[in-house]
């Protein structure tokens, strides 16, 4: 199963997988507007892969078959301040018990 992977010109760490190079006919128009001009990153054969770096291989294959595309979004950003505040609150609570 060959697919083409494109990087978004507008959204950092956002990638679009499509079945055929330069064929975006199955991608919704609104998504293409938000995605911006696609920049080809690579062509890969998913049949020879055991896993992908940032996406679930089986989910990618399923979406390509059912929808004709797969959108890979960036991982959620860590909120280190929120985590620190939660840890401080937990420490304070333990100290009061």
UniProtKB/Swiss-Prot annotation:
Q: Coiled-coil ranges per the record? A: none
Protein name as annotated: YcgL domain-containing protein CPS_3517
Q: Identify the species of origin.
A: Colwellia psychrerythraea (strain 34H / ATCC BAA-681) (Vibrio psychroerythus)
- Which branch of life, at top level? Bacteria
Q: Give each disulfide bond as a residue pair.
A: none
Instruction: Show where the YcgL domain sits.
Output: 1-85
């Amino acid at each position: 199963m060959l697919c083409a992977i494109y990087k978004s010109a507008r959204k950092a760490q956002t990638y679009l997988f499509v079945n055929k190079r330069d064929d975006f006919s199955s991608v919704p128009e609104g998504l293409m507007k938000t995605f911006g001009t696609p920049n080809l990153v690579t062509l890969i054969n998913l049949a020879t892969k055991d896993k992908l770096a940032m996406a679930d291989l089986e989910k990618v294959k399923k979406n390509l078959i059912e929808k004709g595309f797969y959108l890979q979004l960036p991982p959620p950003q860590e909120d280190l301040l929120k985590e620190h505040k939660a840890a401080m609150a937990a420490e304070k609570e333990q100290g009061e018990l």
